[in-house]
Amino acid sequence: MKHAELTKKSQANGIIALSVLGLGLFATAVPSTANADDLELMKPGTLVVAVQPYMPYTAVKDGKLVGLDSDILTAAADKLGLKMEINVTDFPGMLASVQTQRADITIGGIAWSDARQKVGLFTDPPYYSPPAMAVSGTASFPDVASLEGKNLGTVTGYVWAKSIAQVPNASPHTFPNAEGVFQDISSGRLDVGFLDPLLITYQQQQRPDMKVRIEYLKPPTNEQVAAHPDYKYFQAYMTGFYLPKQSPKLAKAVSDQIDGMYKDGSLAALITKWGGDPKQFLVPSPEMAAQRRGVDRPADWNPPSIAK
């Protein structure tokens, strides 16, 4: 989730029922072997997790976390010997819980940003969110030039609303929720819809009758972004799990688990499970290392990757 996640998460309510909002739920992992003092936890042996329901990234079902981010964190917690206490809230509540030390960690497609890292800690990226489009039929839109003159849509408040408005001769449209985007693509009124990538694949699974499919956009060049500044939102971005500033040891421990999952293939398996392409989600773009080097990572840091 990039800028305007508050809106994006609120709009997601049209697809995901927030029936467990505000409840404290518990999911048991393996017996705790981690030293609470070493990991700076709020409660000994327990990882307090703040989430907002947003499938297929995060949700709570039968008292357990489900979704891509949930599976990644559950695997990390298991390896660290921690159980999890789950607090369900909304997106601003997630961030506030971490920033005020009412949660040990929050997850759910959270985009790394310089502003956020100043008031919290980010793990290494569990995955990268590629620029994805919802399309129908056999038409192909490989790059931004192919979008010119087309009917383009997204949800009101999403950053892609700025991007599609800058595409030459295109007709930009915004909708109150993702369902409206899907409906107009299915009916042929829209050529392309810009949404979170796994939301598109999840829609494919849940509503195959709509015949909506995902297509990945080749990111714009630096020259194209210079000419159309809001094209920057057509680029991939880093996600991360978000922790309090006071928890560097926990952030390092979770990052180590994430890095190990890149190496052992388990992250690729989870991305595939939830409808993503590992080559799109687990390979950073060239500019990403520089964004964090000397900011919240050492000067020689390299983002984790499945690329050899």
For each predicted feature, which ranges?
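Extracytoplasmic small-molecule ligand-binding "clamshell" domains
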Residues: A36-I110, D264, A269, K273, ...
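Acidic, polar ligand-binding/catalytic clefts
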Residues: T74, D78, K83-S146, L217-Y233, ...
